């Protein structure tokens, strides 16, 4: 009997602190995922780094042997200056010095990468004034960009996600959850095709040194705002229509980021994912826990603004696709 009482008390203890246990496992899983990534990257990339270091040492030794009039400290000083300039986007190579980094189109591309926090790092401000302006520009521009993306994604989601799902639910009587899942998968497939596969094929043709994998890698690194900077389009020697090309890339990155956020918002609104997310939230038991800045169920871009604002109030009996927090849609909008 004591064992049964102890077992039941343990079960009650686990159930009472279920959210804390789930959160603990979430933190542990994230840390393990970080360690897993570090182990894989280290095991894959470290041998290549070692080979490259050996190759550079051999080239340096051979160069000094062929040019005995040049001392090693002089060569080190020259290479250090070249590498320092390269870090600022200026190359000493004759076939790479024809493109300016701070003409208008290049500056426009740089501004877009700063505001979207992609930041390839291939071009950086050279002057103290440019660095100071970059700080001020980013402090104002990044929140402005978040507000802009929030408004755009909210409006696009209404027309691209909620109204189509509501249309099939009301007009054809399909289950809303099933329609939402199918719609999210189709939307993800279309987005990947239009903003990853097709642009990757285009970049592999326009960029001389890029294959399809490298082009796809650039698209993913850019639209996920990782922006490593190892691949930057439009930097080739004598790039044709470089100004127009840079403007097109800027538009592609902006539209692609919006598309990615719309897909993310669509998946976040799925009922199953909402239930899964709530497993890691703090359970609101007390009245003071109810007062907070952001609702737990509103960790998405479209939740910052009102959902589907301006729709008629007499259609409240039509349940929206998201949750009860979003105002219902018009019947007329679903029949378009």
From Swiss-Prot:
Membrane-traversing stretches: 21-41, 133-156, 182-202, 244-267
Pfam families: Ion_trans_2 (PF07885)
Membrane-embedded but not crossing: residue ranges: 104-116, 117-122, 212-224, 225-231
Cellular location(s): Cell membrane; Recycling endosome; Apical cell membrane; Cytoplasmic vesicle
Residue numbers of Phosphoserine PTMs: 326
Keyword match Methyltransferase: no
Topology term for the membrane: Multi-pass membrane protein
Major location (coarse): membrane
Alphabetized GO MF terms: identical protein binding; inward rectifier potassium channel activity; ligand-gated channel activity; potassium channel activity; potassium ion leak channel activity; protein heterodimerization activity; sodium channel activity; voltage-gated monoatomic ion channel activity involved in regulation of postsynaptic membrane potential
Keyword Ribonucleoprotein: no
Description of activity control: Inhibited by 100 uM quinine. Slightly inhibited by Ba(+). Activity is first increased and then decreased when the extracellular pH is lowered to 6.0.
Coiled coil: none
PTM notes: Sumoylation is controversial. Sumoylated by UBE2I. Not sumoylated when expressed in xenopus oocytes or mammalian cells. Sumoylation inactivates the channel, but does not interfere with expression at the cell membrane. Sumoylation of a single subunit is sufficient to silence the dimeric channel. Sumoylation of KCNK1 is sufficient to silence heterodimeric channels formed by KCNK1 and KCNK3 or KCNK9. Desumoylated by SENP1; this activates the channel. Desumoylated by SENP1; this strongly increases halothane-mediated activation of heterodimeric channels formed with KCNK9.
Cytoplasmic topological domain: 1-20, 157-181, 268-336
Function: Ion channel that contributes to passive transmembrane potassium transport and to the regulation of the resting membrane potential in brain astrocytes, but also in kidney and in other tissues. Forms dimeric channels through which potassium ions pass in accordance with their electrochemical gradient. The channel is selective for K(+) ions at physiological potassium concentrations and at neutral pH, but becomes permeable to Na(+) at subphysiological K(+) levels and upon acidification of the extracellular medium.
PANTHER family named among the record's database cross-references: POTASSIUM CHANNEL SUBFAMILY K MEMBER 1 (PTHR11003:SF59), POTASSIUM CHANNEL, SUBFAMILY K (PTHR11003)
Protein name as annotated: Potassium channel subfamily K member 1
Organismal lineage: Eukaryota, Metazoa, Chordata, Craniata, Vertebrata
């Amino acid at each position: 009997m004591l064992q049964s009482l102890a077992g039941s008390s343990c079960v009650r203890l686990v159930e009472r602190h279920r959210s804390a246990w789930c959160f603990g496992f979430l933190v542990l899983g994230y840390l393990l995922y970080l360690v897993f990534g570090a182990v894989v990257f280290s095991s894959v990339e470290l041998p290549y780094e070692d080979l490259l270091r050996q190759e550079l040492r051999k080239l340096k030794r051979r160069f000094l042997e062929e040019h005995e009039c040049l001392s090693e400290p002089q060569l080190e000083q020259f290479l250090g200056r070249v590498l320092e300039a390269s870090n600022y986007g200026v190359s000493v190579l004759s076939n790479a010095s024809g493109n300016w980094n701070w003409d208008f189109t290049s500056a426009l591309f740089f501004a877009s990468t700063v505001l979207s926090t992609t930041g390839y790092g291939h071009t950086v401000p050279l002057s103290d004034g440019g660095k100071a302006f970059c700080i001020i520009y980013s402090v104002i521009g990044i929140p402005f960009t978040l507000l802009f993306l929030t408004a755009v994604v909210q409006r696009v989601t209404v027309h691209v996600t909620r109204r189509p799902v509501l249309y099939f639910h009301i007009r054809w009587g399909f289950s809303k959850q099933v329609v939402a899942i199918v719609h999210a998968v189709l939307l993800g497939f279309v987005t990947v095709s239009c903003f990853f596969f097709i642009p990757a094929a285009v970049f592999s043709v326009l960029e001389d040194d890029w294959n399809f994998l490298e082009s796809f890698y650039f698209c993913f690194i850019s639209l996920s705002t990782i922006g490593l900077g190892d691949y930057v389009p439009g930097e080739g020697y004598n790039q044709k229509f470089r100004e127009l090309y840079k403007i097109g890339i800027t538009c592609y990155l902006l539209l692609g980021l919006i598309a990615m956020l719309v897909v993310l918002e669509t998946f976040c609104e799925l009922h199953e994912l909402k239930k899964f997310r709530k497993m890691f939230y703090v359970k609101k038991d007390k009245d003071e826990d109810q007062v907070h800045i952001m609702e737990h169920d509103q960790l998405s871009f479209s939740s910052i603004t009102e959902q589907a604002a301006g729709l008629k109030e007499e259609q409240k009996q039509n349940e929206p696709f998201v949750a009860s927090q979003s105002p219902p849609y018009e019947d007329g909008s679903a029949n378009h």
